[in-house]
From Swiss-Prot:
GO function term, MF aspect, one: imidazoleglycerol-phosphate dehydratase activity
Gene Ontology cellular-component annotations: cytoplasm
Name of the protein in question: Imidazoleglycerol-phosphate dehydratase
Highest taxon, organism lineage: Bacteria
Keywords attached to this entry: Amino-acid biosynthesis, Cytoplasm, Histidine biosynthesis, Lyase
Family the UniProt entry places it in: Belongs to the imidazoleglycerol-phosphate dehydratase family.
Localisation per UniProt entry: Cytoplasm
Encoding gene per record: hisB
BP GO annotations: L-histidine biosynthetic process
Length: 208
């Protein structure tokens, strides 16, 4: 829940194109209450993990052309989620700004680092080459792991953050993907939380 002496950090963003219709509601100071429906079951699972482990309250409803392929819906959802994150951050006063996390999942270890800098940048390294061809099947629409990069890149550029995601090692594409999402979640949680020793914008320039 929001601190009574702090402004609410919430956003609702809607985006409609010929390929998708997406609504995202986000509260950065939530408790991990998440409801996601994109029509792509594995992506729903990943976004639920992201919201839960970031301790965001997150509601996502996406309707897209998944009968053709899920890529449009997945990437457009990441765009809107990034926009909501950027809006919810507001003036960024009092936040820690930086965050990072190592996340193990069985044989896999992933790492994510975040700078809420206002300067969007994205680096993605370490995934095995076969991740560009692997498909995680779903009852409604499959998830092609090649989109991992697109999801995080769209999130970073639309939230205007610097985001580095890397897989140090791993074998199972499911574990690699899930560890990356959870690492991003934990890094975001750390970066956007309030620092009790900081009252202004955490930058020597005075703005982010």
């Amino acid at each position: 829940m929001s601190d009574p002496i702090r402004p609410a950090r919430r956003a609702k963003v809607e985006r409609k194109t010929k390929e998708s219709d997406i609504v995202v509601e986000l509260d950065l100071d939530g408790t991990g209450q998440v409801s996601v429906d994109t029509g792509v079951p594995f992506f729903d699972h990943m976004l639920t993990s992201l919201g839960s482990h970031a301790s965001f309250d997150l509601t996502i409803k996406a309707v897209g052309d998944i009968e053709i392929e899920g890529h449009h819906t997945i990437e457009d959802t990441a765009i809107v989620l990034g926009q909501a994150l950027g809006q919810a951050l507001g003036d960024k006063k009092g936040i820690r700004r930086f965050g990072d996390a190592f996340i193990p999942m069985d044989e896999t270890l992933a790492h994510a680092a975040v700078d809420v800098s206002g300067r969007p940048y994205f680096v993605h390294t370490g995934e095995p080459d076969y991740m560009v061809e692997f498909t995680i099947a779903g009852s409604a629409a499959p998830y092609h792991t090649v989109v991992n990069r697109h999801v995080f890149e769209s999130l970073a550029f639309n939230a205007r953050i610097a985001l580095h995601v890397r897989t140090l090692y791993g074998r199972d594409p499911h574990h690699i993907t899930e560890a990356e999402y959870k690492a991003v979640a934990r890094a975001l949680r750390q970066a956007v939380e309030y620092d009790p020793r900081v009252s202004g914008v955490p930058s020597t320039k005075g703005t982010l």
